[in-house]
Amino acid sequence: MLRDTQIFTLIEKEYQRQNEGLELIASENFVSQQIMEAAGSILTNKYAEGLPGRRYYGGCEIVDEIETLAIERAKSLFHASWANVQPHSGSQANAAVMFAVLEPGDKILGFNLAHGGHLTHGSPVNFSGQLYESHFYGVQPETGLIDWEEVGTIAEQVNPKLIICGASAYSRDWDYKRLRAIADQVGALLLADISHPAGLISRGLLNDPVPYCHFITTTTHKTLRGPRGGMILMGADFENPFGKKTTKGKLKSMSTLLDASVFPGIQGGPLEHIIAAKAIAFQEAMSDDYFNYILQVQKNTRQLAQSFVKRGYNIVSGGTDNHLILIDLRNKGITGKLAEEALIKASITLNKNMVPFDDQSPLITSGIRIGTPAVTTRGMQETDMEQIAAWIDDVLKNHENESKIDSIRKEIGNYMLQFPLP
């Protein structure tokens, strides 16, 4: 069989792009060689519909062992009692939970996408906003912070069946204990989508949702530094509150409903090569090396925020607790779109992002989102964050000066030589 030189040439170009540039997209990271090896292994050949020990195909004895390892490691890492590691993505993990606990038209209460939430938390362009009656809470215009009392007030007014917490562009920690009290007060179930801060949560650097939330979903990439995929966790299993029973008349456990919602509900065969890579990522995340890494992510992000504040930039919420910052560029007279386009010319990759109460469209935006997981994986520390802020500031001040931007691009390329990819 002929080698597909066209595709492999493009892969090599992408390698060069990643190797020579500054990767500051908050949802991206660089996985280890052993994770890539597992993801590209012969496990991609195997079909394994069902769960370990209960498959619809033969020859699953070995993948059963692999998936069981992934499940047990996920439970150990997050101190959970139950896990399903089959979701292909965070969005599918969220869909599986919603399909398990909601009926079309049920009310959900999520964090406003325009304030830093996620599409799958009720956005009208997403299944979550099309199948369910979506309501939202957001941040305060004065502080950029979530007002938990207001969340409680909205919940009482809306009376949702499911409350969703979690974000894609919120730089602060979450009060899961307070949210559980709100959920209990209105009789709602509580879902925490920790896709972004999962790595920090797993090692105790942020509040833990597992003791308080009925369901926890996450991606396995981002701060967890694993392969692209999703996962569902529960701190404790419980009988479903909907009266759904087994053929013997016993109430089904919530884990049974969730498993069935993943398969056959929304997926067919699981990706066992990716599940193997997830298992490796979970083991890596329990190591001392990973703890030092994720602690450095938090330190780097705080330093980066300070470096931008020093240069007159407006950090939404005034700072950061996690792995990202959201910068409101309106006082700099440049849109998020223009900033993103100028920075990519300098080999600095990040994304334009809506800021709370934005007066620009989602395709233009007034802000940029910056994350440190990928550059921290490459070995960068606080002093490097100061340099990154200086480069970004320089590009934005000279966004129409092509020669200046090209000079910065070359400087960055040379600088990155000391920080090899894993």
Swiss-Prot record:
Catalytically driven reaction(s): (6R)-5,10-methylene-5,6,7,8-tetrahydrofolate + glycine + H2O = (6S)-5,6,7,8-tetrahydrofolate + L-serine
Pfam families, sorted: SHMT
Keyword Oxidoreductase: no
Residues noted as binding (6S)-5,6,7,8-tetrahydrofolate in the record, renumbered to the chain: 113, 117-119
Matching Gene3D superfamilies: Aspartate Aminotransferase, domain 1, Type I PLP-dependent aspartate aminotransferase-like (Major domain)
UniProt keyword annotations, A-Z: Amino-acid biosynthesis, Cytoplasm, One-carbon metabolism, Pyridoxal phosphate, Transferase
Marked site positions, Plays an important role in substrate specificity: 221
Domain of life: Bacteria
Gene Ontology BP annotations: glycine biosynthetic process from serine; tetrahydrofolate interconversion
Required cofactor names: pyridoxal 5'-phosphate
InterPro entries the UniProt entry points to: PyrdxlP-dep_Trfase, PyrdxlP-dep_Trfase_major, PyrdxlP-dep_Trfase_small, Ser_HO-MeTrfase, Ser_HO-MeTrfase-like, Ser_HO-MeTrfase_PLP_BS, SHMT-like_dom
Stored PROSITE patterns: SHMT (PS00096)
Molecular function terms, GO-annotated: glycine hydroxymethyltransferase activity; pyridoxal phosphate binding
Location of N6-(pyridoxal phosphate)lysine modifications: 222
Gene Ontology cellular component terms for the protein in this record: cytosol
Keyword Amino-acid biosynthesis on entry: yes
Annotated metabolic or biological route of this protein: One-carbon metabolism; tetrahydrofolate interconversion; Amino-acid biosynthesis; glycine biosynthesis; glycine from L-serine: step 1/1
Family affiliation: Belongs to the SHMT family.
Quaternary context: Homodimer.
Protein name: Serine hydroxymethyltransferase
